[in-house]
Curated annotation (Swiss-Prot):
GO terms for biological process: electron transport chain. It is an enzyme of class 7 (translocase). Pfam families: Rnf-Nqr. Its EC number is 7.-.-.-. Part of a membrane-bound complex that couples electron transfer with translocation of ions across the membrane. This is Ion-translocating oxidoreductase complex subunit A. It is a multi-pass membrane protein. The chain crosses the membrane at residues 5-25, 39-59, 63-83, 102-122, 134-154, 171-191. Its main location: membrane.
Length: 192
């Protein structure tokens, strides 16, 4: 049980996929202008990342490895991720049309989010079992969502602040992301 808790905490805080591994930067910068959009994207990504992680594990364990076709791993995982994203898009469209409109183009772009493919591939490379795959995928998703929501809240505050002209827009966003990354470095010794 402790092993699973450490894996979860390590994935969320210590080895955050956005701030440490630099995966998922496109939605991190693109969807973080409004807090409600960031929350919606975080929830959708959490669902997709967890489900894609588990699905990739199952495809690897029960199809690719037994047939000896591990060289098709990346292509297979992209296909699995696309199916999971389409399913998520249909669910969001049915349950929350407002969120569906707010997320706009970013919902289908979860398919190309490198964090989703990165988590699936790292899961296999680190030889996680089924339970660890679920926890790793969920932890990565929670970490992504946490950082996305915190960053969106900071960007909303910065939007109304008196920022010098040369720092407005992307410049202050990158500085803020860098400071946020430094803050998360404080968790480095938490899990070994």
């Amino acid at each position: 049980m402790t092993e699973y808790l450490l894996l979860l905490v390590g994935t969320v805080l210590v080895n955050n996929f956005v701030l440490v591994k630099f995966l998922g930067l496109c939605p991190f910068m693109g969807v973080s202008k409004k807090l409600e959009t960031a929350i919606g994207m975080g929830l959708a990504t959490t669902f997709v990342l967890t489900l894609a992680s588990v699905s990739a594990y199952l495809v690897e364990t029960y199809i690719l490895t037994p047939l000896g076709i591990e060289y098709l791993r990346t292509m297979s995982f992209i296909l699995v991720i696309a199916v999971v994203v389409q399913f998520t898009e249909m669910v969001v469209h049915k349950t929350s049309p407002t969120l569906y409109r707010l997320l706009g183009i970013f919902l289908p772009l979860i398919t190309t989010n490198c964090a989703v493919l990165g988590v699936a591939l790292l899961n296999i490379n680190e030889n996680h079992n089924f339970i660890q795959s679920i926890i790793y995928g969920f932890g990565a998703a929670v970490g992504f969502s946490l950082v996305l929501i915190l960053f969106a809240a900071m960007r909303e505050r910065i939007a109304v602040a008196d920022v010098p002209m040369p720092f407005k827009g992307a410049s202050i966003a990158m500085i803020t992301a860098g400071l946020m990354s430094l803050a998360f470095m404080g968790f480095t010794g938490l899990v070994k």
